[in-house]
Swiss-Prot record:
<keyword id="KW-0206">Cytoskeleton</keyword>
<feature type="coiled-coil region">
    <location>
        <begin position="65"/>
        <end position="90"/>
    </location>
</feature>
<feature type="coiled-coil region">
    <location>
        <begin position="179"/>
        <end position="200"/>
    </location>
</feature>
<keyword id="KW-0175">Coiled coil</keyword>
<dbReference type="InterPro" id="IPR011990">
    <property type="entry name" value="TPR-like_helical_dom_sf"/>
</dbReference>
<dbReference type="GO" id="GO:0030496">
    <property type="term" value="C:midbody"/>
</dbReference>
<feature type="coiled-coil region">
    <location>
        <begin position="250"/>
        <end position="280"/>
    </location>
</feature>
<dbReference type="InterPro" id="IPR042621">
    <property type="entry name" value="TTC23/TTC23L"/>
</dbReference>
<dbReference type="GO" id="GO:0005813">
    <property type="term" value="C:centrosome"/>
</dbReference>
<dbReference type="GO" id="GO:0005819">
    <property type="term" value="C:spindle"/>
</dbReference>
<protein>
    <recommendedName>
        <fullName>Tetratricopeptide repeat protein 23-like</fullName>
    </recommendedName>
</protein>
<keyword id="KW-0963">Cytoplasm</keyword>
<feature type="region of interest" description="Disordered">
    <location>
        <begin position="28"/>
        <end position="56"/>
    </location>
</feature>
<dbReference type="GO" id="GO:0005737">
    <property type="term" value="C:cytoplasm"/>
</dbReference>
Length: 315
């Protein structure tokens, strides 16, 4: 099974990003250029517009650490309220503030860039922008020469790597680059494993869930025509969902349907029908017999019976 080609949106300029970047540069006023109000100025005086503009920048960027904390808190609230565009703007602001506080070559800046990339992918559905910022985050981490000062920082870097490589992997998958997608997703998986081991059984607040990463690995395996491996990943994802949300959650519907497609490609039509039956049963129990979800599940089930050579099937 091959994924249908999709149009990848491209943007020649990112207005929000450019504005924030230049704003961050404006705040870095060298010591020798700062005006001392107690001493007379030499040369021509600043215009009123220049003074107001400078005051606006200084006011906007006062106490950057506090503003960063406020933005990070606001992002969670906006995402919860499904205000994705506003949340993405706050992510851009976090990158700007991180540049000011830590510098462009610090891992904290890479963390902000990786989070922005993940936001472009999951909140906005813009793979091109997601890839650009993920690559920037990757370059920062590769060239960073500092050292971590605590166990907490090491865990945060691992979290950043999980998110970074997951984003790159999914973007590659959307662009039909199966091998590159699987390569990046494997890196994300290794970092997630290391992170979970560092918590020693405790919970870690990852933005990328184990289920999402496992599904992405399954799809990447499928894109590379590794059907058996894809099946292993999808079955693992099903087990994860059942363990966390039970065996009647709507999240299982798409998973069962994707597993059924894999089984059809493996010529295991009976197995495919069983999975589609499970998906249909969940749709009927959660919605109604005549709901769009149940109708779609029923159509897939009928198609599976036709492919297996059956003329009739029992609902």
């Amino acid at each position: 099974m091959r994924a249908s080609p999709i149009r990848i949106p491209t943007v020649t300029s990112d207005t929000d990003w450019d504005f924030c970047f230049h704003l961050s540069q404006q705040t870095k006023i060298p010591e020798h250029q700062r005006t001392d109000e107690s001493s007379p100025t030499s040369g021509s005086e600043e215009s009123e517009e220049d003074t107001k503009a400078k005051e606006k920048v200084i006011d906007h960027m006062s106490h950057p650490r506090e503003k960063l904390a406020q933005s990070q808190k606001k992002i969670a609230q906006l995402i919860k309220g499904k205000k994705n565009i506003e949340a993405n703007k706050e992510l851009i602001r976090c990158v700007t503030l991180s540049r000011i506080i830590f510098g462009e070559e610090h891992w904290k800046c890479a963390q902000a860039l990786a989070t922005l990339a993940y936001g472009y992918l999951t909140l906005r559905g813009l793979p091109a922008q997601a890839k650009k910022h993920a690559e920037s985050a990757k370059n920062v981490l590769l060239t960073w020469k500092g050292t971590t000062t605590s166990d907490k920082e090491e865990k945060q870097i691992l979290e950043t790597l999980v998110m970074l490589y997951y984003t790159l992997g999914v973007v590659c998958l959307l662009q039909n680059h199966g091998r590159e997608a699987y390569f990046n997703l494997q890196k994300s998986e290794r970092n997630m494993k290391e992170l979970r081991e560092s918590y020693k059984g405790g919970t870690c607040g990852l933005q990328v869930s184990e289920k999402d990463l496992t599904v992405a690995l399954g799809r990447a395996s499928l894109a590379n025509c590794r059907l058996n491996l894809a099946l292993v990943y999808f079955e693992k994802a099903v087990d994860n969902v059942i363990a966390n949300k039970g065996d009647s959650t709507s999240e299982l519907v798409s998973l069962y349907q994707e597993i059924a497609q894999i089984e059809q490609l493996r010529r295991n039509h009976e197995q495919a029908i069983q999975y589609l039956h499970q998906a249909h049963s969940i749709c009927v129990s959660l919605y109604t017999e005549v709901s769009p979800q149940a109708a779609e599940a029923s159509a897939l089930l009928a198609k599976a019976y036709a492919m297996s050579g059956e003329v009739q099937h029992k609902a």
